[in-house]
């Protein structure tokens, strides 16, 4: 805290000016650091408790409150006494009491105030001599003279030297005054020395004429009003000086008691507040000085106007007093400026210190975080591309952290500069500067150490990559040499030269010594990398061994005797397959760049072609298997390389773009349209990255030594590939956002930092490209693994990947549906989608009416779900990319629980019928090709069959519960038909095997025809579910009702004889089963139990039972087709004539 200071302004004894009192201990206090001497008038002294208790606000050197002219201005204006400025012979001040008739009426208080004020004006030295009173009573009476003199003598507050009285001039009053004065002389002597004067000339004997005013016969120029104005101005100025001193004292105390703040904001606020107050104090000083100069100027003008003898001593004293006050103000201002300069310097140094400390805390936090982050960078890379990516990350991290390092170094230099400028907090600044330099050096050293390790790792991986490429080229060379051409001496010599020439390149490309590699790269070798180096070395050694064997073999062939020898093809023998070892987790050794795969496709395709020719020539199974194994390894190598490259590219996008969107240092580059849109732009790319990096890539590496089994890896993780569907569904939104913001400086800056040649949108397309790439690689692998152990897994994996691609493609169409009020997710899985030509045929009431509102078909896009089929209208969109994709306006939907199909429509192999609610609504659908129609019919049949199975199982379960809890209804039931149908239904459910697909679409058992004229009840010939079973009953009753209406309601329904086409092979069954194949034509003989029909093959004449579900199309006189509904019955509508 600053030392406390105060200003004391008082009047110097013996003068009418102001000064600071001298105390015994003043000399000691002036020796303190903050003692500032102003003058002998105003002094800045150190405050103490004793000094604070003293009265410091006195302006007059008296014990009472001093009077000012302004306070008794009205009393002074009465002019019953005035101080003209005249002096006696010894310098005594002269106070004149002019003739004032109402002198006796003046109140004592007024008289006392005027006397006190007049006697306080001269200096203490002049007042000490004593005052001379001139009482003019020439026009008064003696009684008044006596009373006046006695009153004056009794109330005069100062020393009296002489009282001169001009007695009355009337004869009577003069005679009376002489007599009275003689008799009362003793009274006057006891109180004041009084001299009675008869005339003015007598007065001149005591006081010189130059010291008397004109009314007393003198020459002294005196104007009472002018004197009163001068006194008021001088005293006003003196009061201003006093108030200024008090203000400076208060301000100095405030500055001294102010504690230094601990933060930048508070220090700045204190400095600004003190500066404003200092400016105000300086303004008050300026106004006081201006006022003093104005008063001094007026006094000097008055002196210049008058003659030299007319200038009295009081005027000179007034002028000197004003000059002294002005000098005091100037000295006070200088002392205050000096004090303020020290205070301001300390506040500014405090502010500099707070800025330094704040910057130190910020930079230290950044450097500590950077040091912690660099400490986590322990990965040295598992491939060349990975190391290059790590080096780019390190360079980017160093660039970002370099700003903080430069700031720390600059801050350290600022601290050194503060120390050089003699800052008061040197002991606090110097350690912080040293710590900043230490942090910067430590961080730079860690960056350099990390860069050195990665450079070593890069060098090692480049050597390994070179060795791997050399091995691959050697394998390509061996695979591309035709064995049949090597049988001749010339061919063997040519092949031998190729091998020897290739082996000569090994000195530059292969790893010479394994221990030397371990020793040279000891600082970076971990367990995984050592294993990787070992396997590369083993691969190199194995390849060299194969080359040496081939070389020895070729040398023998080249050295043979040239004589005709009948070539004999070796007998093909099955190669003993060694069991594939349990795959162990290892790091991939191949380069992760996607270009590698592209460069290798040409050689191994050429090798495959030449080996195919070679196999035709020699027919060697062993050579063929070896060649296929090489090709499988190439496909596996390409799969791993492209997978690693894919993972690296995803990581690059996530760290170089997605993470930077949350970086505060890059926020100013983001456009407003990108705020909070990271999930829209990148979708679930992070989820895809974590799946491939943590799971799929590592599992793929386990199959490096047995690539033919890689299909198992795909099958085990097939459900995880569903994440691509979410990404593809978000792709239109992502691409739309990219088109809006592709020119954003943020993307350009990120691309520059990553050193990418392609923009972000190319990398956002990578997941879509990758999911389509798998099926191509699986096809290649399957092509070279037909007779291997994992061929079935490869085939299943390929089918599953194609199914995922189809699901992704279908979902892209599904999200384009507009106008559907419900939730598409409630409709179940999307099975198929496609565009068709559709005609409608409706039936209303009990009469069937064809409503062909259009002669031209409607173009509709159908979406087949598990629970409904949707009809939509396709609308083409204008735009680019995904915005050009069509949208689909929803028109109507059909619940699959009430849908039936007619597989063939007469006259067109591409048409089929979808009918609804017992053919109340019929939709004739024409597919683009017969194949598409067959696929849709088959898929719809699967849906209806699965619904029927679920219905039958539920019905059997309920029937079983009812049979255990309720007795069978009595024959005397009020509804015999209904009761009979329930019993028959229960028997049917017991007979039907729920696991047999032959019973899914069977008709009711018909052991004998029903009685003529009674007809069939709706429940006696169908496997309908109870009424509470999800709508199956209502759907079936509508179908049967439709059948009855179309038959006209006449008598019982009979089986229509005719021919049927077999649509599914049937080779299994009992001794009475008829073996048929798809496409055979059979004739219906009898409908039996459990969904079996008894038919005859007209070609062979054989008869037997076949499942009714295998018979689809009836070829008879009616020309109508068999239909399948969700109720599961084979519905045979009546032929119309």
Swiss-Prot record:
<dbReference type="GO" id="GO:0005615">
    <property type="term" value="C:extracellular space"/>
</dbReference>
<feature type="domain" description="PH">
    <location>
        <begin position="829"/>
        <end position="945"/>
    </location>
</feature>
<dbReference type="InterPro" id="IPR001251">
    <property type="entry name" value="CRAL-TRIO_dom"/>
</dbReference>
<dbReference type="InterPro" id="IPR051336">
    <property type="entry name" value="RhoGEF_Guanine_NuclExch_SF"/>
</dbReference>
<dbReference type="Pfam" id="PF22697">
    <property type="entry name" value="SOS1_NGEF_PH"/>
</dbReference>
<dbReference type="InterPro" id="IPR036028">
    <property type="entry name" value="SH3-like_dom_sf"/>
</dbReference>
<keyword id="KW-0472">Membrane</keyword>
<dbReference type="InterPro" id="IPR001331">
    <property type="entry name" value="GDS_CDC24_CS"/>
</dbReference>
<dbReference type="Pfam" id="PF23289">
    <property type="entry name" value="Spectrin_5"/>
</dbReference>
<dbReference type="GO" id="GO:0012505">
    <property type="term" value="C:endomembrane system"/>
</dbReference>
<dbReference type="InterPro" id="IPR036865">
    <property type="entry name" value="CRAL-TRIO_dom_sf"/>
</dbReference>
<comment type="subunit">
    <text>Interacts with GTP-bound RAC1. Interacts with CDC42. Interacts with RHOA. Interacts with CCPG1, which results in specific inhibition of its exchange activity toward RHOA, but does not affect its activity on CDC42.</text>
</comment>
<dbReference type="InterPro" id="IPR035534">
    <property type="entry name" value="DBS_PH"/>
</dbReference>
<feature type="modified residue" description="Phosphoserine">
    <location>
        <position position="1041"/>
    </location>
</feature>
<dbReference type="GO" id="GO:0051056">
    <property type="term" value="P:regulation of small GTPase mediated signal transduction"/>
</dbReference>
<feature type="region of interest" description="Disordered">
    <location>
        <begin position="557"/>
        <end position="625"/>
    </location>
</feature>
<feature type="modified residue" description="Phosphoserine">
    <location>
        <position position="1034"/>
    </location>
</feature>
<dbReference type="GO" id="GO:0005085">
    <property type="term" value="F:guanyl-nucleotide exchange factor activity"/>
</dbReference>
<dbReference type="Pfam" id="PF07653">
    <property type="entry name" value="SH3_2"/>
</dbReference>
<keyword id="KW-0963">Cytoplasm</keyword>
<dbReference type="InterPro" id="IPR011993">
    <property type="entry name" value="PH-like_dom_sf"/>
</dbReference>
<comment type="function">
    <text>Guanine nucleotide exchange factor that catalyzes guanine nucleotide exchange on RHOA and CDC42, and thereby contributes to the regulation of RHOA and CDC42 signaling pathways. Seems to lack activity with RAC1. Becomes activated and highly tumorigenic by truncation of the N-terminus. Isoform 5 activates CDC42.</text>
</comment>
<dbReference type="InterPro" id="IPR056466">
    <property type="entry name" value="Spectrin_DBS"/>
</dbReference>
<feature type="compositionally biased region" description="Basic and acidic residues">
    <location>
        <begin position="607"/>
        <end position="616"/>
    </location>
</feature>
<keyword id="KW-0728">SH3 domain</keyword>
<dbReference type="GO" id="GO:0035556">
    <property type="term" value="P:intracellular signal transduction"/>
</dbReference>
<dbReference type="InterPro" id="IPR035532">
    <property type="entry name" value="DBS_SH3"/>
</dbReference>
<dbReference type="GO" id="GO:0035091">
    <property type="term" value="F:phosphatidylinositol binding"/>
</dbReference>
<feature type="region of interest" description="Disordered">
    <location>
        <begin position="1116"/>
        <end position="1137"/>
    </location>
</feature>
<feature type="modified residue" description="Phosphoserine">
    <location>
        <position position="457"/>
    </location>
</feature>
<protein>
    <recommendedName>
        <fullName>Guanine nucleotide exchange factor DBS</fullName>
    </recommendedName>
</protein>
<dbReference type="Pfam" id="PF00435">
    <property type="entry name" value="Spectrin"/>
</dbReference>
<feature type="modified residue" description="Phosphoserine">
    <location>
        <position position="480"/>
    </location>
</feature>
<dbReference type="InterPro" id="IPR000219">
    <property type="entry name" value="DH_dom"/>
</dbReference>
<feature type="domain" description="SH3">
    <location>
        <begin position="1055"/>
        <end position="1116"/>
    </location>
</feature>
<dbReference type="InterPro" id="IPR001452">
    <property type="entry name" value="SH3_domain"/>
</dbReference>
<comment type="similarity">
    <text>Belongs to the MCF2 family.</text>
</comment>
<feature type="modified residue" description="Phosphoserine">
    <location>
        <position position="620"/>
    </location>
</feature>
<feature type="compositionally biased region" description="Low complexity">
    <location>
        <begin position="584"/>
        <end position="597"/>
    </location>
</feature>
<dbReference type="GO" id="GO:0005829">
    <property type="term" value="C:cytosol"/>
</dbReference>
<dbReference type="Pfam" id="PF13716">
    <property type="entry name" value="CRAL_TRIO_2"/>
</dbReference>
<feature type="repeat" description="Spectrin">
    <location>
        <begin position="351"/>
        <end position="456"/>
    </location>
</feature>
């Amino acid at each position: 805290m600053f030392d406390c200071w105060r200003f004391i302004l008082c009047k110097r004894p013996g003068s009418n000016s102001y000064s600071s009192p001298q105390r015994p201990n003043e000399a000691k206090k002036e020796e303190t650091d903050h003692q500032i001497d102003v003058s002998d008038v105003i002094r800045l002294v150190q405050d103490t408790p004793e000094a604070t208790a003293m009265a410091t606000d006195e302006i007059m050197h008296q014990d009472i409150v001093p009077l000012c002219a302004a306070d008794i201005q009205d009393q002074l204006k009465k002019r019953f006494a005035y101080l003209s400025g005249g002096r006696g012979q010894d310098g005594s001040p002269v106070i004149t009491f002019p003739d004032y008739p109402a002198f006796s009426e003046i109140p004592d208080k007024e008289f006392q105030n005027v006397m006190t004020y007049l006697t306080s004006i001269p200096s203490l030295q002049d007042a000490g001599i004593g005052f001379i009173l001139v009482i003019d009573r020439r026009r008064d009476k003696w009684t008044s003279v006596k009373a006046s003199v006695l009153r004056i003598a009794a109330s005069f507050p100062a020393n009296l030297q002489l009282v001169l009285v001009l007695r009355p001039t009337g004869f009577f009053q003069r005679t009376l005054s002489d007599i009275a004065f003689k008799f009362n002389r003793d009274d006057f002597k006891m109180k004041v020395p009084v001299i009675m004067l008869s005339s003015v000339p007598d007065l001149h004997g005591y006081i010189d004429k130059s010291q008397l005013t004109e009314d007393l016969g003198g020459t002294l120029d005196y104007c009472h009003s002018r004197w009163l104005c001068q006194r008021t101005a001088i005293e006003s100025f003196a009061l201003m000086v006093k108030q200024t001193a008090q203000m400076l004292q208060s301000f100095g105390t405030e500055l001294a008691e102010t504690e230094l703040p601990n933060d930048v904001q508070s220090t700045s606020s204190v400095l600004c507040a003190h500066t404003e107050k200092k400016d105000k104090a300086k303004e008050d000083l300026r106004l006081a000085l201006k006022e003093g100069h104005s008063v001094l100027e007026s006094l000097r003008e008055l002196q210049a106007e008058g003659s030299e003898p007319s200038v009295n001593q009081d005027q000179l004293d007034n002028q000197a007093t004003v000059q002294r006050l002005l000098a005091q103000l100037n000295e006070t201002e200088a002392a205050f400026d000096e004090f303020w300069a020290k205070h301001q310097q300390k506040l500014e140094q405090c502010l500099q210190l707070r800025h330094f400390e704040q910057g130190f805390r910020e930079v230290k936090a950044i450097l500590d975080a950077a040091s912690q982050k660099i400490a986590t960078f322990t990965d040295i890379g598992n491939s060349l591309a990975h190391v290059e990516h790590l080096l780019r990350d390190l360079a980017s991290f160093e660039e970002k952290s370099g700003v903080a390092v430069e700031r720390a170094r600059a801050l350290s230099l600022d601290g050194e500069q503060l120390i050089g400028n003699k800052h008061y907090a040197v002991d606090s600044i110097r350690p912080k500067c040293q710590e900043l330099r230490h942090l910067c050096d430590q961080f730079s050293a860690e960056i350099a150490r990390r860069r050195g390790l990665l450079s070593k790792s890069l060098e090692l991986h480049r050597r390994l990559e070179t060795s791997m490429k050399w091995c691959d080229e050697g394998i390509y060379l061996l695979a591309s040499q035709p064995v049949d051409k090597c049988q001749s001496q010339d061919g063997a010599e040519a092949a031998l030269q190729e091998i020897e020439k290739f082996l000569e390149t090994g000195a530059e490309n292969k790893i010479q010594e394994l221990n030397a590699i371990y020793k040279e790269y000891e600082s970076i070798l971990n367990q995984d990398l050592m294993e990787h180096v070992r396997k590369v070395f083993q691969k190199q050694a194995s390849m060299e061994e194969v080359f040496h064997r081939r070389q020895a073999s070729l040398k023998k062939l080249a050295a043979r005797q040239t004589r005709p020898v009948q070539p004999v093809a070796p007998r093909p023998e099955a190669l003993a397959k060694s069991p594939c070892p349990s795959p162990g987790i290892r790091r991939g050794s191949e380069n992760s760049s996607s270009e590698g795969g592209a460069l290798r496709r040409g050689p191994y395709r050429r090798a495959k072609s030449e080996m195919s020719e070679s196999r035709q020539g020699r027919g060697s199974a062993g050579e063929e298997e070896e060649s296929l194994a090489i090709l499988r390894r190439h496909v596996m190598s390409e799969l791993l390389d492209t997978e690693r490259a894919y993972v690296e590219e995803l990581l690059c996008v996530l760290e170089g773009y997605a993470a930077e969107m949350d970086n505060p240092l890059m926020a100013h580059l983001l456009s407003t349209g990108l705020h909070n849109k990271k999930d829209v732009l990148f979708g679930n790319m992070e989820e895809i990255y974590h799946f491939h990096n943590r799971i799929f890539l590592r599992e793929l590496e386990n199959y490096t030594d047995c690539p033919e089994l890689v299909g198992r890896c795909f099958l085990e993780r097939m459900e995880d590939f569903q994440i691509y569907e979410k990404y593809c569904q978000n792709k239109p939104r992502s691409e739309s956002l990219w088109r809006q913001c592709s020119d954003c400086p943020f993307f350009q800056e990120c691309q520059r930092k990553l050193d990418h040649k392609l923009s972000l949108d190319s990398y956002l397309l990578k997941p879509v490209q990758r999911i389509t790439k798998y099926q191509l690689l699986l096809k290649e692998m399957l092509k070279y693994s037909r007779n291997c152990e994992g061929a079935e897994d490869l085939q299943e994996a390929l089918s599953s990947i194609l199914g995922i691609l189809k699901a992704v493609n279908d979902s892209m169409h599904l999200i384009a549906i507009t106008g559907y009020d419900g939730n598409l997710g409630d409709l179940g899985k999307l099975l198929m989608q496609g565009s068709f030509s559709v005609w409608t045929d409706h039936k209303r009431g009990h009469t069937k009416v064809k409503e062909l509102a259009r002669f031209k078909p409607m173009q509709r896009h159908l979406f087949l779900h598990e629970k409904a089929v949707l009809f939509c209208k396709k609308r083409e969109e204008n735009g680019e990319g995904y915005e050009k994709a069509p949208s689909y306006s929803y028109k109507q939907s059909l619940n699959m629980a009430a849908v039936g199909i007619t597989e063939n429509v007469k006259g067109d192999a591409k048409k089929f019928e979808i009918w609804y609610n017992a053919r109340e609504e019929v939709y004739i659908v024409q597919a683009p090709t017969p194949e598409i129609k067959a696929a849709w019919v088959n898929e719809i049949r699967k849906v209806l069959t699965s619904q029927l199975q679920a219905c039958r199982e539920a019905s059997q379960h309920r029937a079983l519960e009812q049979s255990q809890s309720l007795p069978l209804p009595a024959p005397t039931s009020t509804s015999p038909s209904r009761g009979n149908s329930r019993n028959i239904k229960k028997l049917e459910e017991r007979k039907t095997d729920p696991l047999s697909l032959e019973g899914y679409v069977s008709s009711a058992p018909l052991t004998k025809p029903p009685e003529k004229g009674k007809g069939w009840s709706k429940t006696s010939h169908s496997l309908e579910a109870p009424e509470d079973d999800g709508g199956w009953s209502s759907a079936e009753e509508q179908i049967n009702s439709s059948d009855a209406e179309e038959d006209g309601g006449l008598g019982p329904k009979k089986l229509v004889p005719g021919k049927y086409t077999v649509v599914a092979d049937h080779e299994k069954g009992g001794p009475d089963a008829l073996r048929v194949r798809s496409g055979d034509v059979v004739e219906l003989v009898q409908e039996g139990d459990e969904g079996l029909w008894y038919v005859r093959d007209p070609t062979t004449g054989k008869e037997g039972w076949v499942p009714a579900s295998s018979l689809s199309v009836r070829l008879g006189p009616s020309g109508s087709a068999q239909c399948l509904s969700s109720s599961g019955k084979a519905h045979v509508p009546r032929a119309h004539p």
